[in-house]
């Protein structure tokens, strides 16, 4: 059985957690990022490290050309690229909105295209998992840009799952609420903001990358063999329930 996994955005907090969980589970991991120095800092000499920009077709083509040249055919993809661009629509610059779409949706589309193309050429089944957000499912103030991008991502997941099911390729996503990672550090840097963030959730608290990574690795594993086209929430009930007001 081929147990090569590809992790994009690997130098980030979630990417590192997913890489660690995959390696623990016995996968050979290929880690990808735009900054080679950050990859080196995160992983030292561990794992095959490839510098590529997955937000462009050229970057994705270069990535999969490198994999092909090295006879590496990943059968699992954990796409951990994204950003959190907050702000009301009328205040957001066009550049910031475009960056949000590129990081959260465009990169996912191009990477999925490269991944599924290589699997189909190899005649191999596989699985991909992407990262959405609770904001795609419930209106949250100042989340217009990221909500639009992640809602598009969820549509991509369902469409691709339908397209590639007959080839044995599964496509899913996870949708966390607030997680404690370097990307969110500024939002919960004070006791006041941390307490406010914690109290939003029916199950109070802030998630961490290791929790989400555990679910992502499960979805990529044989245990998730009957799961495709799904978006799994890990948000303390934020997007689905309302507790009693006491």
Q: Which residues are covered by each model-predicted region?
A:
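Alpha-helical segment proximal to the catalytic Tyr-Lys
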Residues: 117, 162-166, 225
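Short C-terminal tail/terminal secondary-structure segment
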Residues: 228-246
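C-terminal helical subdomain
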Residues: 173, 192-227, 234-236
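Substrate-binding pocket helix/loop in short-chain dehydrogenase/reductase
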Residues: 88-89, 93-101, 197
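Active-site helix of classical SDR
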Residues: 112, 149, 157
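Conserved glycine-rich cofactor-binding loop
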Residues: 11-12
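Residue(s) in the substrate-gating loop at a strand-loop-helix junction
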Residues: 133
